[in-house]
Amino acid sequence: MNDATQPHPLKNFPVSWEELHRHSKALAWRLLELGPWSGIVAVTRGGLVPAAIVARELDMRLVDTLCVASYDHQTQGRIKVLKGIAGDGEGLLIIDDLVDTGDTARVVREMLPKAHFATVYAKPAGRPLVDTFVTEVSQDTWILFPWDIEPQFAPPLASARR
């Protein structure tokens, strides 16, 4: 079964802004002693916020983007590189929010084989492709990042009885 035909995950794992900040800071702690890094590369769009937090915590100012498109809502499709990075990645720290099936990570690894690849969250299928991660979630879990959800009105429980 390929990624485009995979069934939707069975579980949702909502992540708040506070949790994402805490987990991204924990990632920075793990990366602190592994440097020094010449720069950070955020894999867009999911890696932008974690990369900003890691850059702050590691006191790094050089942040670039690797623009990759693979998801359309909850369906992973063909991977398109919209903006690459020159070189082999030596000295670079790549940051993404999540490694899922590993398809995006494989493309990134091919482009920047000497970079250190770090994600906040990792699923089992993609975990071997990253060097550092903070939180593992099961393959059948869909992570709901705070930029993908919004609060909305929920009627009181008692109103359902009327």
Feature map (PLM): residue ranges:
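PRPP-associated nucleotide enzymes
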Residues: 1-162
